[in-house]
């Protein structure tokens, strides 16, 4: 398959429970700081041909592309943790959910102001995430001036 073309099956879709589980696990895979554990999580929830369209306009392909990109972001976000913000929304084989990045240790403190706020939109095929879009609504540009670069 060409990197310029993505095919999606439209005949069937997963249950809402499967979709919610996948988007929650998508957000949580950033909690794996060990690259081998993160790669195992990536392989469990993402299709081999995953395409990730990230907030800065970059595109990443396959399990190795997700591992490389997530490693770069985690290196930039040392001392911070991802957490889900609210619930997931599901429509057939598409799901969306919001997330935040907060200082490590403050994940349960919902008064903690996040340094990044964003969300993910994903498309699932055969119980694996096939396409992922990540967007950022707000981030601390002083603290994270080179985020994603």
PLM feature spans:
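Hydrophobic alpha-helical core bundles mediating ligand binding, dimerization, or RNAP-core interactions
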Residues: 23-30, 46, 70, 97-101, ...
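A solvent-exposed, acidic/Ser-Thr-rich amphipathic alpha-helical stretch
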Residues: 37-93
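Compositionally biased, intrinsically disordered low-complexity regions enriched in proline and serine
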Residues: 30-33, 61-64, 81, 136, ...
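Short, low-complexity N-terminal intrinsically disordered segments enriched in polar/charged residues
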Residues: 1-45
């Amino acid at each position: 398959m060409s990197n310029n073309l993505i095919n999606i099956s439209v005949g069937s879709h997963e249950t809402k429970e499967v979709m919610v589980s996948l988007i929650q696990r998508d957000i949580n895979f950033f909690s794996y700081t060990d690259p081998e554990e993160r790669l195992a999580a990536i392989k469990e929830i993402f299709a081999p041909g995953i395409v990730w369209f990230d907030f800065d306009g970059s595109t990443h392909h396959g399990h190795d592309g997700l591992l490389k990109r997530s490693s770069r972001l985690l290196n930039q976000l040392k001392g911070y943790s991802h957490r889900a913000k609210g619930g997931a929304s599901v429509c057939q084989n598409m799901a969306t959910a919001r997330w935040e990045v907060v200082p490590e240790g403050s994940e349960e403190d919902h008064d903690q102001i996040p340094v990044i706020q964003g969300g993910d939109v994903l498309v699932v095929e055969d119980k694996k995430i096939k396409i992922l879009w990540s967007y950022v609504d707000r981030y601390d540009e002083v603290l994270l001036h080179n985020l994603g670069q």
